[in-house]
Amino acid sequence: MAKKTRKVDSKEVGLEIGFSLFRYFLNTEYLHYGYFCEGLAAEPQNLAPAQTRYAEFLKSNIPAGVQKILDVGCGTGRFAFELTNAGYEVDCVSPGAILTNHARKLLGERCHIYNCKFEDVATDKKYDLILFSESFQYIDTNRAFTKALKLLNPGGHIMICDFFKTDPDNKCKLGGGHDFQHYVEAVKKYPVTLIHEQDISKETAGTIDLANKFTMEVLLPTYKLVFLLLEDRFPWMTKFIKWKYQKKLEKIERKNLSGERTGVNFMRYKKYMFYLYKVVE
């Protein structure tokens, strides 16, 4: 039997939910992690300024002479918007439908958006810098570098800011990220020179603490109250749901509602890295 094709991407739905929550409660349209450097505590009211600092960190590392940028996985388009305000010519890659609509509303005619996967971008245009801001983890490393090299001008740059797995046994409750050692070895095959490398795990870990606090203080109580109400109103249906989806519910509780998705565990099992490469001419 053919495998049923899912028309709705769960990752994109998750990002859309996050965007709605961030915009309504925290007054931010960024979807990336916050950069909690010294003097900025990991508190809900500080997420928006921490995300702005993250964006400023990326901009501050754009090499002189760069004019044309391809933002891979542009999210809501907010960072691309800021880059155009700074005078850069920016195009975007956005594979999903939901976030692409947000980006198009914000960017208008400022940027061309390739509504496809990065590997499927078809264009004769060349860029000075290709940016992967928390999008690299969704693309195979070899495919990402192979495609990037085809789209870059001679002497162009690749900027990656994302987290990687450092736990070979995969004990971490936090998903996502390429295996760090595999990534380091894979990049050696390509004609690029490492210009700047920086570990920002400590600065970004506060984002995980905020997410965990929201989970434990809002989502978990809500989850329990919903089942409490269902058991009172629809006892037989609730028993059936718990029996039918026992393994899935246990997985959700174990992975997402255990309270183990903390900044400390993030730094223990993950490594959030910034890389800037220059293509060898």
Identify the residue ranges that each predicted region occupies.
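N-terminal, positively charged/glycine-rich alpha-helical extensions of SAM-dependent methyltransferases
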Residues: 1-38
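Class I SAM-dependent methyltransferase SAM/SAH-binding core
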Residues: 70-120
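A short SAM/SAH-binding and catalytic strip from SAM-dependent methyltransferases
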Residues: 129-141
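A short glycine-rich, Lys/Arg-flanked "PGG" loop and its adjoining helix->strand segment in the class I
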Residues: 143-157
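Conserved alpha-helix/loop element of class I SAM-dependent methyltransferases that forms part
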Residues: 48-65
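Substrate-binding/catalytic lobe of Class I Rossmann-like enzymes that use SAM or dcSAM, i.e.
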Residues: 171-262
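A short acidic, Gly/Pro-enriched loop at the edge of an enzyme's catalytic core
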Residues: 120-130
